[in-house]
């Protein structure tokens, strides 16, 4: 289809674009070489390649930088609202009621609160909430949500029940994500990406409904994981524990993966979300083993 605006404000429209172009070529001013080239197959290929390059550059560098700026302007109340909304949805989809008694849950919460008070004296109980859930889907896992909510699964507690220091280190890692606001940064980045794609394809509706899935399926960046690992190391060190206690978790999880997925060549492949492969797990194990204040 072709559309031509006339000087008096009216317009001409023709449904057959090829016929219109032939007529203009004979009776009117020929199109520029740039327009002709852009209409060609190679022009379309270049346009697609440029679009792909733009999206990759935006995802890798522009969106992370922009999300940092946006998050700095977000009020804590909004971040908390996003996190609690995500938690409510996760309870419907993937999280079941914990089998741990209220007394046992309180024991773990009190232990973490005591250690956090020693490591981060300025933090208060209102800055975080710790929930326990059973989950066949997530298995041995722990993760943090925007606004200070953290979840640890029964399966992880059972795996490390005789290693409370390691459990505390994992919670210290998740609280590191809370402190650095990694969760809300990931949500903002995904939201900006959705808006960008919506601008390109014309549909950006329904993003808020995908926030829980975004939080549970998107890996943190290498830098975010390093920051959370550093926070866990500092947390443990402040409580007179060497961060090498974290390696117990990796060792046991690898063993459980090997037993469950003998046919898989890489037992690290199914590491839980909170400890996904960014940076490589061997690098993280080395970090905890060799950590020095």
Task: For the regions a language model picked out, list residue spans one by one.
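N-terminal intrinsically disordered, acidic low-complexity segments at the extreme N-terminus
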Residues: 2-32
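A Zn2+-metalloprotease active-site environment signal
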Residues: 26-293
């Amino acid at each position: 289809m072709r559309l031509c605006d006339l000087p008096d404000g009216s317009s001409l429209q023709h449904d057959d674009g090829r016929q219109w172009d032939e007529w203009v070529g004979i009776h009117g001013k020929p199109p520029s070489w740039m327009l002709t080239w852009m209409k060609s197959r190679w022009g379309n290929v270049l346009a697609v390649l440029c679009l792909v390059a733009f999206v990759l550059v935006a995802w890798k560098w522009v969106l992370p930088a922009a999300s940092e700026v946006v998050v700095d302007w977000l009020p804590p109340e909004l971040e908390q609202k996003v996190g609690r909304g995500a938690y409510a949805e996760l309870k419907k989809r993937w999280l079941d009621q914990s089998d741990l008694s209220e007394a046992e849950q309180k024991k773990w919460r009190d232990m973490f609160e005591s250690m956090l008070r020693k490591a981060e004296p300025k933090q208060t109980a209102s800055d975080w909430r710790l929930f326990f859930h059973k989950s066949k889907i997530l298995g041995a896992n722990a993760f943090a949500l925007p606004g200070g909510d953290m979840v640890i699964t029964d399966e992880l507690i059972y795996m490390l029940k005789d290693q409370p220091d390691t459990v505390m280190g994992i919670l210290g890692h998740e609280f590191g994500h809370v402190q650095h606001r990694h969760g809300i940064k990931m949500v903002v980045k995904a939201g900006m990406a959705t808006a960008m794609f919506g601008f390109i394809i014309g549909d950006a509706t329904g993003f808020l409904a995908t926030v829980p899935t975004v939080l549970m399926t998107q890996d943190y960046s290498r830098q975010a994981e390093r920051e959370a690992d550093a926070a866990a190391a500092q947390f443990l060190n402040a409580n007179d524990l060497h961060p090498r206690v974290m390696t117990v978790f990796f060792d046991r999880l690898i063993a459980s993966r090997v037993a469950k997925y003998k046919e898989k060549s890489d037992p690290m492949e199914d590491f839980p979300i909170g400890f996904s492969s960014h940076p490589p797990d061997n690098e993280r194990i080395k970090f905890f083993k060799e950590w020095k204040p």
